[in-house]
């Protein structure tokens, strides 16, 4: 299918605008978060107060590593590679447990272990960041560490049914409060499974390791068999260890994010049967999110036990742009492209923080007003979702269909 003239023009404008947002706003904000002591400052509150002595999350640093490495690959600005190297050194020297293996959850502002929990989710993001850094500079040490983390995940976290998630410093199984919500004591989550797929996709792309490929295929199969709910065209969120669903939660942002990440995983894996299966699954999910969660301007957050949460979350809008643009490229359905452009329009008008020194508002009311209830930067607020949105849109081929 060929683009119509309006959509082609809209895509060109979209690419120009996200490039400008990336270069003139997102990158400069995160440049200022660099800590000369090592790594990046661990928190800025929603009123833009920098907390220089806040603890530093390993997830934050893995995502920052991914961001600067990927931005360098796109923009070829050598200064971005130095920011990536700064994040890499901190992740390697301070967040990695050389005695027991794996990444800590967080360290102090000076780089000493703070929350020494080992979480499968955390290890996955470290692999993701390390792979991007290897792509950017060819550092074999980074790729070796990524492979070591893969082996650690496989040897330490797997049970009969899949991957357990939360462990002590010495890899004793503990409660999974960090990735559970709504009072549900989840032993397995869609979220961690999705980001294992994301990480293993990149590691397999680089190494073509049979072991990594086999586990990536298994993760895609278990997602289709156990996590995907074909009756409602959605992903279940929380589970016990045997994949029995806990609660009734529908995460709109994770669903639309999953569509493009799983499409990418299938592309990299090259399994024709899985690719065909996921074409149907991901198109169904995208259609459902468009029908249920998109109100014409923005995406709702989630539904829990039948109660809608209409909060406008920064990462949900960003993943919506990427997910719907991918859905358009895969199907040729111009409605998906229109939705992606509408979400970007909302982001420009409301989600981007226009205050001097701000980045993106984390949370907005349904009326588009900032809630100032969540970090401007912190353990979960980083340039991964919005920065990646810019980079993915920038590289989307205008003739992708």
Region roles according to the model:
Residues 1-401:
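Glycan-recognition and catalytic cores of secretory/periplasmic carbohydrate-active enzymes
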